[in-house]
Amino acid sequence: MKRRVETITFDGGTLEYSVTGKGTPILVMHGGHSNCYEEFGYTALIEQGYSIITPSRPGYGRTSKEIGKSLANACRFYVKLLDHLQIESVHVIAISAGGPSGICFASHYPERVNTLTLQSAVTKEWLTPKDTEYKLGEILFRPPVEKWIWKLISSLNNAFPRLMFRAMSPQFSTLPFQRIKSLMNEKDIEAFRKMNSRQRSGEGFLIDLSQTAAVSLKDLQAIICPVLIMQSVYDGLVDLSHAHHAKEHIRGAVLCLLHSWGHLIWLGKEAAETGSILLGFLES
């Protein structure tokens, strides 16, 4: 995928970002372990005349971790990015652990946000220090360990793509692999391999773990733009209560429950439906 990758510096902090496609601007808040090279769902949007701006969130890629001292501070930098690009307002798509960033941005800068789409998104406190996943995340996905973890995953995935998909996909789903197999698309294996090749945690995932509780009811209730919430009923990473929580507290929000095989709603036999629902929302 052709994209322009650059950085801007403001108040001593560096923000890395990419721009791909030409047309109506969309600002994407990527999920955990990702960066400005994210590409899930991008092709369909670009083909329909959208330009996608993806900042590496704090601690990911070349973006300074200091920018992420709070969600509000990070959002100041996203505003500066739009100013730098001379963009008045954008559609915002917030994915998974990027949910809190999208919610904060839409609630604090309503004049800059045309619509907000939450995809498999965290919308309230997620993992806590009491959770096994939190403890494992702190050990495995902190520098410098995370670098070697992702190198190992990437190497294994490149060598044994089908085996790794079979081993790892159930972590993203509440379904056993045999059910996933019936819902998957053959292209999912390559998309999954590419995902694992581009992922790194940097300092970003630890920041994500520490900030999910920072999303308040006040933030959700302050959002005034049209909102679409998309999540699979089989999501194994983010509980469905997050989607229902957002629906309950954001005025006029539309909840769309999907039947894709898990957290990665851009994969599987339902992927085309995911794309068409999003495009229909953006164009309405």
Curated annotation (Swiss-Prot):
UniProt xrefs under InterPro entries: AB_hydrolase, AB_hydrolase_1, AB_hydrolase_fold
Domain (AB hydrolase-1): residue spans on this chain: 25-123
A Pfam family per the record: Abhydrolase_1
Keyword Hydrolase: yes
PANTHER family found in the cross-reference section: BLL5160 PROTEIN, HYDROLASE, ALPHA/BETA FOLD FAMILY PROTEIN
Keyword annotations from UniProtKB, A to Z: Hydrolase
Organism this protein belongs to: Bacillus subtilis (strain 168)
Coiled-coil boundaries: none
Protein name (database record): Uncharacterized hydrolase YcgS
Record flagged with keyword Hydrolase: yes
Residues at the catalytic site: S96
One example GO MF annotation: hydrolase activity
